[in-house]
Amino acid sequence: MKILFATLLVVTTPHLVTGQIHWGNLSKIGVVGTGSASYKVMTQSSHQTLVIKLMPNITAIDNCTKTEIEEYKRLLGTVLQPIKVALNAITKNIKPIKSSTTSRRHRRFAGVALAGAALGVATAAQITAGIALHQSMMNTQAIESLKASLETTNQAIEEIRQAGQEMILAVQGVQDYINNELVPAMGQLSCDIVGQKLGLKLLRYYTEILSLFGPSLRDPISAEISIQALSYALGGDINKILEKLGYSGSDLLAILESKGIKAKITYVDIESYFIVLSIAYPSLSEIKGVIIHRLEGVSYNIGSQEWYTTVPRYVATQGYLISNFDDTPCAFSPEGTICSQNALYPMSPLLQECFRGSTRSCARTLVSGSIGNRFILSKGNLIANCASILCKCYTTGSIISQDPDKILTYIAADQCPIVEVDGVTIQVGSREYPDAVYLHKIDLGPPISLEKLDVGTNLGNAVTKLEKAKDLLDSSDLILETIKGASVTNTGHILVGAGLIAVVGILIVTCCCRKRSNDSKVSTVILNPGLKPDLTGTSKSYVRSL
C-alpha cells in the first residue's frame, strides 16, 4: 500500500518531486534539465605516509649493472637536489614555540613559528604549506630506521612498521621487473644484455619520475601531486596501492575522478635515493535532500531576432528551496557531484520565480553570432529552433517549417520518426512535449545584455539618463520654490486688499448711518403738531391756504 501511494505521489506531483522546478514552463522558453545528481562534500582528510624508493635492490645482478646504476644515480640527483634544497630552506626556519608561562611544571609545546627574517620572501601558500610540512615530518631517528628497512627490502610494495608510529608504505616501481624478469634470466642472458635491459628500464622509470616531480621543482613546498600521476611512479598498479593505504570507501571512484587524493613531498634523501610523501585522502559526506540539476538552453526566434533564456548552468534544490551552485570546486561522476567545499549560495527571488514557472521573470538576451544551442534532445523529443536551422523529416524527405507565431518546434515520432536537423540524424520517441507553444501564450521576461561591451554601453546610457533626470528634478525643484514664493506674496497682497476694502466699507456704512440719523431729526422738528403759529389778524383765506 505504501509503495502504491508513493507511486501515485510521483505520478500526480512531478514538479514537487523535482524540487519545485517547473520544467514544463521552462521548456516553453527553451530550458530543459539534462540530469540530476546527489551532492557530496569532502570532509576532513586522513593522512598516510608513502615512501617512493627510487633505487631498486640489485644485489642479485650487481656485477652486471654498475655502470647503469651510476648513470641512474646521476640523473636522480638532478631531480632530487633542487627539491632537497627548497625543503631545507623552509623547514630549518620553522621552530617550535614553548608556552609563555614561567612555571616549569606548566611549560608545554604551543606550536611552531616561521623565522620570516631568515627566510626572506615567501607567499602565504608556501608559509601555510611549510607549517603543515613541519608537522608531518619524521624525526631523525625515524628517518634512520626507515633507511635501514629500505636497504634490506627487495619487494615492490613493502609495509614498514616502526615502533610507536603508523604503518609506512614503501614502493619501488622497478623492483618487480628485476625480481620477475632479470634475475630469472641471468643464466640465459649475458651480463651486457642484463645491464642494457636494466638501463632502459631505469631510464624509462626516471622519465616517469621527472614527469611526476618536475612541476615540484619550481615550488616543492606547496605543490600537490594527484594519485593518478603518482601511480606511474608506483608501477602503475593504483588499486594495489590504494588497498595497501587502507582506503576501501564506496566513493573511491568518485574521489579519484574528483582528484581528491593528493600527495605532498615531506622529505628527500639524496644518499639513499628515496622520497617521503604524505598522502591525504578525504572521506565524503552526502548532504541529504540536496539535488544538483544541470540545465541546457535552446535559442528561440521572435520574428527575425534570435533569443535565448539566461539561466545558470547548474542549480540546487532542497525541498522547496532553490539555490545557485558554483561548479568550480566540484567534479561530476556517476556516483554524484563531489565538491571540495560548500558550493551552494543564495539565489535572487526573481530567478527563483523563473524556475518555479513564471516565464516573465526569466531574462533573455540576443544570440550573438553562432553562440547557443539550436536543438536539444529531451525525453526522446527533439526541441529545435527550426527558424534558425534546417529541420527535415528524414522519413518523408519533407522540410519541417516553424510557424512564425511559434518560438520553438517540438518534434516527436507522431510527426516524424527520424529527423535530420543541422546535418545530424536523430530518431525520436513518443510525444512528451505538446507542440503548441505560441508566442502570444507566453509572457517573456525582460531583455538584457551579457556582452561586456553591450553591458558597458547600457550602463553608460543609464548613467547619462540618470544625470539628465537629476538635472530635470533640480529644475522642477527650482520652479516649485519660485511658485511657492510667488503664492505667498500674492496671498499677502490679497489679504491687505481685503482689509482695505473692509475698512472703506465700514467707513461708508458709518457715514450713511450718520446722515440718515440727521435727516430723521430734521423731519421730526418740522412735522411736530404741538407747535402752532400765531394767526392773529390774518385773513381766513390765508389761513385756509396754510
Swiss-Prot record:
Membrane topology: Single-pass type I membrane protein; Single-pass membrane protein
Signal peptide: 1-19
Transmembrane segments: 492-512
GO cellular component: a single term: virion membrane
GO biological process: fusion of virus membrane with host plasma membrane; symbiont entry into host cell
Region (Fusion peptide): 109-133
PTM comment: The inactive precursor F0 is glycosylated and proteolytically cleaved into F1 and F2 to be functionally active. The cleavage is mediated by cellular proteases during the transport and maturation of the polypeptide.
UniProt keyword annotations, A-Z: Cleavage on pair of basic residues, Coiled coil, Disulfide bond, Fusion of virus membrane with host cell membrane, Fusion of virus membrane with host membrane, Glycoprotein, Host cell membrane, Host membrane, Membrane, Signal, Transmembrane, Transmembrane helix, Viral envelope protein, Viral penetration into host cytoplasm, Virion, Virus entry into host cell
Residue ranges, Cytoplasmic side: 513-546
Subcellular location: Virion membrane; Host cell membrane
S-S bridge residues: C330-C339, C354-C362, C386-C391, C393-C416
Main localization category: virion
Coiled-coil regions listed: 134-162, 458-483
Gene3D superfamilies: 1.10.287.2480, 6.10.10.110, Head and neck region of the ectodomain of NDV fusion glycoprotein, Newcastle disease virus like domain
Annotated glycan sites: N25, N57, N63
Site positions per UniProt: Cleavage: R108, F109
Physiological role: Class I viral fusion protein. Under the current model, the protein has at least 3 conformational states: pre-fusion native state, pre-hairpin intermediate state, and post-fusion hairpin state. During viral and plasma cell membrane fusion, the heptad repeat (HR) regions assume a trimer-of-hairpins structure, positioning the fusion peptide in close proximity to the C-terminal region of the ectodomain. The formation of this structure appears to drive apposition and subsequent fusion of viral and plasma cell membranes.
Assembly and binders: Homotrimer of disulfide-linked F1-F2.
Family as reported in the entry's similarity comment: Belongs to the paramyxoviruses fusion glycoprotein family.
Name the record gives this protein: Fusion glycoprotein F0
Lineage, broadest ranks: Viruses, Riboviria, Orthornavirae, Negarnaviricota, Haploviricotina
Gene behind the chain: F
